[in-house]
From Swiss-Prot:
GMP binds at residues 197-201, 324-325, 373-376, 380, 399-402, 475. Catalytic component of the tRNA-splicing ligase complex. Catalytic subunit of the tRNA-splicing ligase complex that acts by directly joining spliced tRNA halves to mature-sized tRNAs by incorporating the precursor-derived splice junction phosphate into the mature tRNA as a canonical 3',5'-phosphodiester. May act as an RNA ligase with broad substrate specificity, and may function toward other RNAs. Keywords: GTP-binding, Ligase, Manganese, Metal-binding, Nucleotide-binding, tRNA processing. Binds 2 manganese ions per subunit. GO terms for cellular component: tRNA-splicing ligase complex. Its EC number is 6.5.1.8. Coiled coil: none annotated. This is RNA-splicing ligase RtcB homolog. SUPFAM superfamilies: Hypothetical protein PH1602.
Amino acid sequence: MHVPGTFYVNDALKGLLFEELQQAVVRGDHGGFLPAVKQLANVAALPGIVKRSIALPDVHSGYGFAIGNVAAFDMDNPEAVVSPGGVGFDINCGVRLLRTNLTEAEVGPVREQLAQALFDHIPVGVGSQGIIPTTAKDMESALELGMDWSLREGYAWAEDKEHCEEYGRMLNADPRYVSSRAKKRGLPQMGTLGAGNHYAEVQVVDEVYDAVAARRMGIDTPGQVVVMIHSGSRGLGHQVATDALVAMERAMARDGIITNDRQLACARINSEEGQAYLKAMSCAANYAWVNRSSMTFLARQAFAKIFKSTPDDLDMHVVYDVSHNIAKVEQHCVDGQHRRLLVHRKGSTRAFPPHHPLIPADYQLIGQPVLVGGTMGTSSYVLTGTEQGFTETFGSTCHGAGRARSRNNSRNKLDYQDVLDNLKAKGIAIRVASPKLVMEEAPESYKDVSEVVDTCHQAGISKKAVKLRPIAVIKG
């Protein structure tokens, strides 16, 4: 290990980490499974890593890097690497939050109709195909321009991109580095939710912890209705990652790079393979922002239909849009010196502090909004970034609850009807394309998101602003 590993966990979450470690001892590394503790140590041994390998409270085993792992690499160190495993297969999987001027009293009586309207408007599920008309030429433009393409084509409002990480566009994107297979997979999926833990939720403001921050974001009234969309780059992002892993295995053999785990395939940042991946990854990130923008357009249409109004009159503005699977070049202070770092965030969210130049003007006094999605039927949170987090975790915090059970375990141990009945008992309308996903994504499959968020708050790496409660959910 070149640097130490640091875990941000409380006693309850620490117990889950040790359970995962114990499972690994019993079953071995069958199927490539490694516990998060070991994965964090393996990342700490990668060339060019600085400061520490960081595990956030929602950490659990992933591919190469654990999900919930943050690691930064010195751009000026010729040995430093970029690893697709540090971003994940769903590049720029992220969350967008829309506010409305509706209340729970207005939406509650029609939540079933609203859930159905969202389900009808937004294509969901494995293999779902979008209804946004997209040609091969459009795809090239979307990969390069990100949300600027959405704005040009009429699927976004001008102010949407102002409230988006990177303003919805990675400038170093170059579609020439995205394979034809990746483009072919992405073309029919524009504006689709996908499956797994992706969702669109209608939520209400449940508690306000920071009135100033909540007011600045326009979500300061308990009972106010908001919409959360969680999705990523679909098959295109998966193919970009797959293509890069193959190329990087060759680069490792050529350059003599040795890692502790084959899943940590990587390349020197400034190598041909490293730069090709970063350009293709940026295209996939742009695709994901276009995807969430397209679903925002569709969600606005669904609300307008149900409430016989316009999205503008319903005040359906974007509060913020964050990525939690990405690698970006950022300026940070390491050992008292300002350094250019390639920060890998996998299952973790950027959380920049007040006055940082890369956050919108209207959030300068409160810090960057951080959107933390809960599980199906549990609360979600809006946090803000802190100066302490910028110093300790490269301006990063948690992204969600984090799995506590494997998908297979959830399918075997949970009953479909029981999960649905529990959601209905909480007054939540649900539409799901695949029944098995109800078990896989049930609250029992995940850690307690409140424990995760509270741990980050108590550690000072982010600050709680608003708690959100679901009243309608659509899933793939």
